[in-house]
């Protein structure tokens, strides 16, 4: 029986794919080194998440990725052979939709992090654009991260893996996730046939559609990549006003209802 879970390895999510004998994921591939300058590795106390650089001083990730002694790495591709322009920062401030940090509430799994100092744009570090409009159904989008590449074993790659998935009708997710509201501020995305999905270790990572961040990895099935069990992503477009207000200095801004 497939169980619902917050895709976290003790508070974290990761991309998940079934493996081929070549050690590549089914339907996915190791990301090109120049394919993800906005991708952030968020980690604390042995846990890891993904994140997205949206300007030189701000990162978007999932609320359930929060933790003490958090660090963020930028410009990272291979964990074993870091790029020369890799940079590390820590949070200066964190902002959440709910003061209780109750990220389980659909559409509230979002955290905006202000860095202790801006990063310097470089060959492997550059921000990703916020959405200009929401994605339509059947849009092909990209997921990526250093998460486990097996749905049944925790096998973490040295470099992030990338795969394409589709924006699906919200009804597909509502059929599996009890309590998911029709108008919740989330996106339903995946492959109905299974085989490509997010999994443990990539919570907070981006769902990228047409060169813009449209979603934040939030919740998925267990095991990962099961047929007709897509994942849920916090919908960035519905939080644009909140994000822009916080960045502009209005720290009292409230999230959409």
Curated annotation (Swiss-Prot):
Disulfide bonds: 31-162, 49-65, 97-255, 141-209, 173-188, 199-224
Tissue: Expressed by the venom gland.
GO terms under biological process: proteolysis
Family annotation (SMART domains): Tryp_SPc
GO molecular function: serine-type endopeptidase activity; toxin activity
Compartments, record wording: Secreted
Principal subcellular localization: secreted
A GO cellular-component term linked to this record: secretory granule
Subunit architecture: Monomer.
Function: Snake venom serine protease that may act in the hemostasis system of the prey.
PANTHER family per record: KALLIKREIN-1, KALLIKREIN-RELATED
Protein name, per record: Snake venom serine protease KN2
């Amino acid at each position: 029986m497939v169980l619902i879970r917050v895709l976290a390895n003790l508070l974290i999510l990761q991309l998940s794919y079934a493996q081929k004998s070549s050690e590549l994921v089914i339907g996915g591939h190791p990301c090109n080194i120049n394919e993800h300058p906005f991708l952030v590795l968020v980690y604390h106390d042995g846990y890891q998440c993904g994140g997205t650089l949206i300007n030189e001083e701000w990162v978007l990730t999932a609320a359930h990725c929060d933790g003490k002694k958090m660090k963020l790495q930028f410009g990272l591709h291979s964990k074993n052979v870091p790029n020369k322009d890799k940079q590390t920062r820590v949070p200066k401030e964190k902002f959440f939709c709910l003061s209780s940090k109750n990220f389980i509430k659909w559409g509230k799994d979002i955290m905006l992090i202000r860095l202790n100092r801006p990063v310097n744009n470089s060959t492997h570090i550059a921000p990703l654009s916020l959405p200009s409009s929401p994605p339509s159904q059947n849009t092909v989008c990209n997921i990526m991260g250093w998460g486990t590449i097996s749905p049944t074993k925790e096998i973490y790659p040295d470099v992030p893996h990338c795969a394409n998935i589709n924006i699906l009708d919200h009804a597909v997710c509502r059929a599996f996730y009890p309590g998911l509201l029709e108008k919740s501020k989330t996106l339903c995305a995946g492959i109905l046939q299974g085989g490509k999905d997010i999994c443990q270790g990539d919570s907070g990572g981006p769902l990228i559609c047409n060169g813009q961040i449209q979603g934040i990895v939030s919740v998925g099935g267990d095991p990962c990549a099961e047929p007709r069990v897509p994942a849920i992503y916090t919908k960035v477009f519905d939080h644009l006003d909140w994000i822009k207000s916080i960045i502009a200095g209005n720290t009292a801004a409230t999230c959409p209802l």
